[in-house]
Regions:
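Conserved active-site histidine-acidic residue motif and adjacent donor-binding/catalytic loop
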Residues: 37, 175-176, 184-198, 209-211, ...
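Short His-centered aromatic/hydrophobic patch
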Residues: 55-61, 77-80
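Membrane-proximal helix-turn-helix segments that form the acceptor-binding/catalytic region
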Residues: 80-102
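Donor nucleotide-sugar binding/catalytic pocket of nucleotide-sugar-dependent glycosyltransferases
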Residues: 97-132
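A charged, aromatic-enriched C-terminal amphipathic alpha-helix characteristic of glycosyltransferases
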Residues: 131, 264-297
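Short hydrophobic beta-strand element within catalytic cores of glycosyltransferases
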Residues: 227-230
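Conserved acidic donor-binding segment of nucleotide-sugar-dependent glycosyltransferases
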Residues: 244-253, 260-265
Length: 297
């Protein structure tokens, strides 16, 4: 839709180029769905069609896919990886020797991007800003994430049992049912269903404890009319900056105190401040930077 550039997607279940099944592999304290061994003929057909190949999280493609070296590549790095991972990746990338432009979505992903290129470019994640949204003034808490330690569903579970929040509804988008949870579980909804859930809630809790590089769901939640309350992870503070409402990560006492104090404030004004802060992630503003990379590299 931009500058008459035609784009197609090569990936699992893509309508353009379906690369086949994925494997769910534990990685970086989570579970990643990875196309480790894509359909080789379809992959090469997709690459042959393109002038520029834009790859998100290039580690697996660079190591396992045997990419042709006669193409223009742009690599976008999202993950916040520890020093051990980045040390080995830097060595491996020197062996692979595929040149390309390296992009990172946040400061937390910078060290990841530098393993491939010493001068990466910052282009944040982006969404289409909803111009006609207002704060959802409802008593609904929302959690989004897998039931794994770093997503910290446990705090959400504990909140659902608190007497002081018995007038609130608790809803979670996650990957499995939770026994004795005092709320509603949505198991792996599709994008349309997810959007409806966001628009029907009002308070999004990002309770993550580590290994986050950006936090796109924070922006999605605000863009759907939710106020966001999050742990004080660097990645989250980079996204929301002064508009953020933060508690000390891993401290349930801090979360309870913050919620109590926040609910004494004007939630509509707090949401408006957050909504104003996410304007810098508007796709219309940021996609132009990728277009320049496509055309000039």
């Amino acid at each position: 839709k931009t500058s008459n550039i035609e784009s197609k997607i090569a990936g699992p279940n893509s309508k353009d180029y379906n690369l086949g099944r994925v494997l769910n592999i534990p990685f970086n304290n989570s579970v990643a769905s990875i196309s480790l061994f894509p359909d080789r003929k379809i992959l090469l057909k997709a690459i042959e069609w393109s002038d520029v190949v834009h790859i998100h999280e290039p580690f697996i493609p660079l190591i396992f896919w045997k990419l042709p070296k006669n193409k223009k590549y742009i690599f976008t790095h999202h993950a916040n990886l520890n020093k051990l991972y980045t040390f080995f990746m830097r060595i491996i990338y020197k062996i692979v020797k595929i040149k390309g432009v390296s992009v990172y979505v946040s400061e937390s992903a910078l060290s990841n991007a530098k393993t491939l290129n010493n001068q990466p470019i910052l282009i944040p994640n982006m969404i289409e800003i909803n111009k006609n949204i207002e704060f959802n003034n409802k008593k609904k808490f929302l959690f989004v994430g897998r039931n794994e330690k770093r997503k910290n569903f446990n705090f959400f579970y504990l909140l659902s049992k608190e007497k002081s929040f018995q007038d609130y509804e608790f809803e979670a988008i996650t990957n499995e049912n939770i026994k004795n949870f005092n709320g509603v579980i949505y198991l792996k909804p599709n994008d349309d269903e997810k959007n409806i859930i966001f628009k029907n809630s009002s308070i999004y809790l990002a309770l993550n404890t580590k290994n986050e590089s950006f936090g796109i769901t924070l922006i999605e939640a605000i863009n759907s009319g939710n106020i966001v309350i999050s742990s004080n992870l660097t990645a989250f503070k980079d996204v929301l900056e002064e508009s953020g409402i933060y508690y000390e990560r891993n401290s349930y006492k801090s979360l309870l105190s913050l919620l109590t104090n926040t609910f004494k404030s004007d939630l509509h004004l707090l949401w408006e401040k957050q909504y104003k802060s996410i304007q810098k992630y508007d796709i219309e503003k940021n996609m132009e930077r990728y277009v320049l990379l496509y055309l000039n590299n």
